[in-house]
From Swiss-Prot:
The active site is at D35 (proton acceptor). PROSITE patterns: MACRO. Residues 1-175 form the Macro domain. Homodimer. Interacts with RNase III. One of its GO terms (biological process) is purine nucleoside metabolic process. The lineage of its organism: Bacteria, Pseudomonadati, Pseudomonadota, Gammaproteobacteria, Enterobacterales. Keywords: Hydrolase. Its EC number is 3.1.1.106. This is O-acetyl-ADP-ribose deacetylase. HAMAP family: YmdB (MF_01205). GO terms for molecular function: O-acetyl-ADP-ribose deacetylase activity; purine nucleoside binding; ribonuclease inhibitor activity. Substrate binds at D11, I12, N25, G33, V34, D35, S122, T123, G124, V125, Y126. The gene is ymdB. Transmembrane segments: none annotated.
Amino acid sequence: MTSRLQVIQGDITQLSVDAIVNAANASLMGGGGVDGAIHRAAGPALLDACKLIRQQQGECQTGHAVITPAGKLSAKAVIHTVGPVWRGGEHQEAELLEEAYRNCLLLAEANHFRSIAFPAISTGVYGYPRAQAAEIAVRTVSDFITRYALPEQVYFVCYDEETARLYARLLTQQGDDPA
């Protein structure tokens, strides 16, 4: 049986999955890192959809997630989530990061998505230590997929080889084949 969890090193904007997750900022207006890359690749339709969400419900709070069409991307949808800014680990960062992953998965399940791709949420400009963030990501996603049939396939998309090895090691430790 193939694992429902896989690690990919590469560009999340190039994946043909039901949903890609955007590590967004609260404004949903694009930014640096993966957020900027997703907005550039998706084109202006993504920004328009994000503006509409802001008009309807305001900013996206830390740990929350919202869904938009994917614009020019191969994915069906983009799920935007706001991870926590690392402030030393004493400000509920772990709980908020777990909540961000779980809320993305709940949106994917509610929309009957079979596949979802996650970047390493909060590990860029938000400064979350990669190893700790990866442990939370793998644990949260693993717990979720034991309880829900969807999504059937979850990809951890890592920009660099070091992060990909970190995720692969964590999946191997829990008995999953990350390839």
